């Protein structure tokens, strides 16, 4: 005899309620969070502008139906597109993530919280243009910064103690959840409607990490976040119509997220939602490289300079040893053929070989015309990683959040260079004073890729003056980026 099904509808899961209460009620008071969000905004937009240099990215942009122009539609930076908020969120999100050069959060789960800007900026611009058209006040860029801080916090706090990669799920599911909550609040949904929206995000089938790992590594990893943040806008708009939610989306026996996708485990939390994640987020400033390799690339650049001074070249190298942390080995320690740029920018051997050979690492170095140089694979074969448990412990320590790598070079003549250790990359919170000027330089370089000098200056005059930027209507700011 089968057991009777309990059909009493439960209250919303506590985890969902906490997200919604945070986006609706928490006041961001941290100056550090707003300072960081300001530079994060500029860096994220700049990453999107650089991606427009790559045809593989550009071919995915624009309306679903070519030629479609949406009245009061979202302006996609660096283009002439005028799109609905769902497709605009995909466009902006894909641009941001394409080159793996935007911010990073490392914990039990990894991710790139500025991916959420796709949905946030698209929604804010769409709302602003429609408000102006009907004689109402538009949203300001301060509201965008607030949304960014909250989306960073939701994604990052869940990621602190909960590893989705361990069960084969991609971190973009957290982009979907965070963007849904923030966008729903931005759209003016009621508490019940935001609860519904967030539950809808959790009951979606979530993206697999298949496309991030050998032997299937591919370009979906560059547009997966755009897909997630655009899905968030769609779900929030559906909830706005009164579409129902699913209260025990996480905890329902058999059918909920925990039982279906998380091996029956519940989420663990290290801290309540505040502004911790934005304050401590990592920026990729010098190199477009998967973040676990950033300090290794920095060390390799130092070693390249030492080789130059000693009259040596990469051809003289016998062996390269990388002392690293466990996450680095699990994600990017890769041998064998590398099939495409997406494969190469997730291989620490490739990302160390390029600076040892050429004294640089740029996005262009992942392309086929560079990768065909046989010296790269020859050097990759000489590079080996091994875990240092201390580096792994420091990586997980919330007071340190180190991403340490150490490289030793041994040469064919029997000599060796002293090990070069880099614990914190220049984009780390501990190196903000060094990093921010370089981050601004990166933004300026990316503006110059797309805009004439006069337009660059107009963008910079507003963008570098935070007080002025915060007061500016979202639609007016994005108008500055139209080509």
UniProtKB/Swiss-Prot annotation:
| InterPro entries with a match to the protein in the record | 2Me_IsoCit_deHydtase_PrpD, MmgE/PrpD_sf, MmgE/PrpD_sf_1, MmgE/PrpD_sf_2, MmgE_PrpD, MmgE_PrpD_C, MmgE_PrpD_N
The annotated pathway is:
Organic acid metabolism; propanoate degradation; Carbohydrate metabolism; tricarboxylic acid cycle; isocitrate from oxaloacetate: step 2/2
Which reaction is recorded as catalysed by this protein? (2S,3S)-2-methylcitrate = 2-methyl-cis-aconitate + H2O; citrate = D-threo-isocitrate
Query: Is Lyase there in the keyword field?
Result: yes
Reported EC number(s) for this entry are 4.2.1.79, 4.2.1.3
Q: Which stretch is the leader sequence? A: none
One GO term of the biological process aspect: tricarboxylic acid cycle
Tell me which UniProt keywords the record has, alphabetically.
Answer: Lyase, Tricarboxylic acid cycle
Single GO MF descriptor: aconitate hydratase activity
* Physiological role: Involved in the catabolism of short chain fatty acids (SCFA) via the tricarboxylic acid (TCA)(acetyl degradation route) and via the 2-methylcitrate cycle I (propionate degradation route). Catalyzes the dehydration of 2-methylcitrate (2-MC) to yield the cis isomer of 2-methyl-aconitate. Could also catalyze the dehydration of citrate and the hydration of cis-aconitate.
The annotated subunit structure for this chain is: Monomer.
The family classification in the record reads:
Belongs to the PrpD family.
The record's annotation in NCBIfam families points to: PRK09425.1 (NF006943), prpD (TIGR02330)
| Protein name per its UniProtKB record | 2-methylcitrate dehydratase
**Lineage of source species:** Bacteria, Pseudomonadati, Pseudomonadota, Gammaproteobacteria, Enterobacterales
């Amino acid at each position: 005899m089968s057991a009777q099904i309990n059909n009493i509808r439960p209250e919303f899961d506590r985890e969902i309620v906490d997200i919604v209460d945070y986006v609706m009620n928490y006041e961001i008071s941290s100056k550090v969070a707003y300072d960081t969000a300001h530079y994060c905004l500029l860096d994220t937009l700049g990453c999107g502008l650089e991606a427009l240099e790559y045809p593989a990215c550009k071919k995915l942009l624009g309306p679903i139906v070519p030629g479609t122009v949406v009245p009061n539609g979202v302006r996609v930076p660096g283009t002439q597109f005028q799109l609905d908020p769902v497709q605009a969120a995909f466009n902006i999100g894909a641009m941001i993530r394409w080159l793996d050069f935007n911010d990073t959060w490392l914990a039990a789960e990894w991710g790139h919280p500025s991916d959420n800007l796709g949905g946030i900026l698209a929604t804010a611009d769409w709302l602003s243009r429609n408000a102006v058209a009907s004689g109402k006040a538009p949203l300001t860029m301060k509201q965008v910064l607030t949304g960014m801080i909250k989306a960073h916090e939701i994604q990052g706090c869940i990621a602190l103690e909960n590893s989705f990669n361990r069960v084969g799920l991609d971190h973009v599911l957290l982009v979907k959840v965070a963007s849904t909550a923030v966008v729903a609040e931005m759209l003016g949904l009621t508490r019940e409607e935001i609860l519904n929206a967030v539950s809808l995000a959790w009951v979606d089938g979530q993206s697999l990490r298949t496309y991030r790992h050998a032997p299937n590594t591919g370009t979906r990893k560059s547009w997966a976040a755009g897909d997630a943040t655009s899905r968030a806008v769609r779900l929030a708009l559906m909830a706005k119509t009164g579409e129902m939610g699913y209260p025990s989306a996480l905890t329902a026996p058999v059918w909920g997220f925990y039982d279906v996708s998380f091996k029956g485990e519940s989420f663990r939390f290290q801290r309540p939602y505040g502004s911790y994640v934005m304050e401590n987020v990592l920026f990729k400033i010098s190199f477009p490289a998967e973040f676990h390799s950033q300090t290794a690339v920095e060390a390799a650049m130092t070693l390249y300079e030492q080789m130059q001074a000693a009259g040596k070249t990469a051809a003289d190298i016998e062996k390269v040893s990388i002392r690293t942390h466990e996450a680095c080995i699990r994600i990017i320690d890769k041998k064998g053929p590398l099939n495409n740029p997406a494969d190469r920018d997730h291989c620490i051997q490739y990302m160390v070989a390029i600076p040892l050979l050429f004294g640089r690492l740029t996005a262009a170095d992942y392309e086929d015309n560079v990768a065909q140089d046989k010296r790269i694979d020859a050097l990759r074969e000489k590079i080996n990683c091994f875990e240092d448990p201390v580096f792994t412990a420091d990586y997980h320590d919330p007071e340190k959040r180190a991403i340490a790598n150490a490289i030793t070079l041994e040469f064919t003549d029997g000599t060796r260079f002293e090990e070069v250790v880099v614990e914190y990359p220049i984009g780390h919170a501990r190196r903000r004073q060094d990093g921010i000027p370089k981050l601004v330089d990166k933004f300026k370089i990316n503006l110059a890729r797309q805009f004439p000098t006069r337009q660059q200056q107009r963008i910079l005059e507003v963008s570098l003056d935070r007080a002025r930027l915060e007061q500016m209507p979202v639609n007016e700011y994005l108008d500055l980026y139209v080509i």
